[in-house]
C-alpha cells in the first residue's frame, strides 16, 4: 500500500487513531507509521475494535483505517449504521443474501458494497446521503445533475393541426 496524499493527512489519521485509543479502542493491527518507511506520508492499514459511542464512529476518516464495532444482530448493525449525520458508503460482509438485501434497503447511505469493498464503476452514480453528498456524479444520473431540461415542440409548417383542433374555423368562431 502506498503513502497517503500528504503528511498533513497522515498526521490527521494519527490523531484520529490516538483519540480512539484514548477512548478505549483496541488496535487490532497497524495504527502507526511503518518503521522502514520514515520518509513520506506512510501509515499502516489499521483496524480498530471500537464501541458505538467513540468519536471515530461518527466521523469520516478518508485514510487506511477501519473501525470495527461488534453488534448483537442485524437490527443493531443497521441502527448503528444509521446513527450518523453522514452517509457516503457502507460495507456489508455476509453470506446471507436476504440479510444483505434488507441492510441495503434500510441503511441510509448513498453507496453500499456487499462483499466487494470499495469497487467502483464510472457508469454507476456516485454520491452520499445526509451531510455527505447532495446529488450524484458519474453515470447517467450524474450527467443529469448538469442538465436543465426544457420541453420544446416544433411543427414543421405553420399549417393548422387537425389533431389538435379538428374543427374548421367557420364552425369554431361562427356560433
Model-derived segments and spans:
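Short beta-strand to alpha-helix junction loop
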Residues: 3-14
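Short, solvent-exposed loop/turn elements at beta->coil junctions and helix N-caps
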Residues: 31-37
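General beta-strand structural signal in soluble alpha/beta enzymes
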Residues: 27-30, 114-116
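Conserved C-terminal structural/oligomerization subdomain of aldehyde/semialdehyde dehydrogenase
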Residues: 35, 42-175
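Short intrinsically disordered, low-complexity coil segments enriched in acidic
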Residues: 1-3, 154
Amino acid at each position: 500500500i502506498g503513502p497517503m496524499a500528504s503528511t498533513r493527512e497522515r498526521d490527521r489519521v494519527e490523531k484520529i487513531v490516538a483519540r480512539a485509543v484514548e477512548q478505549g479502542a483496541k488496535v487490532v493491527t497497524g495504527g502507526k507509521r511503518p518503521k522502514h518507511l520514515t520518509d513520506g506520508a506512510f501509515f499502516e492499514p489499521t483496524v480498530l475494535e471500537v464501541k458505538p459511542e467513540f468519536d471515530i464512529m461518527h466521523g469520516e476518516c478518508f485514510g487506511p483505517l477501519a473501525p470495527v464495532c461488534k453488534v448483537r444482530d442485524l437490527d443493531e448493525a443497521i441502527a448503528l449504521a444509521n446513527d450518523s449525520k453522514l452517509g457516503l458508503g457502507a460495507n456489508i460482509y455476509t453470506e446471507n443474501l436476504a440479510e444483505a438485501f434488507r441492510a441495503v434497503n434500510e441503511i441510509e447511505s448513498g453507496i453500499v458494497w456487499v462483499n466487494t469493498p470499495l469497487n467502483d464503476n464510472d457508469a454507476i452514480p456516485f454520491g452520499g446521503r445526509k451531510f455527505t453528498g447532495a446529488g450524484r456524479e458519474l453515470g447517467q444520473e450524474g450527467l443529469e445533475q448538469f442538465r436543465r431540461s426544457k420541453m420544446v415542440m416544433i411543427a414543421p409548417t405553420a399549417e393548422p393541426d387537425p389533431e389538435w383542433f379538428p374543427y374548421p374555423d367557420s364552425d369554431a368562431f361562427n356560433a
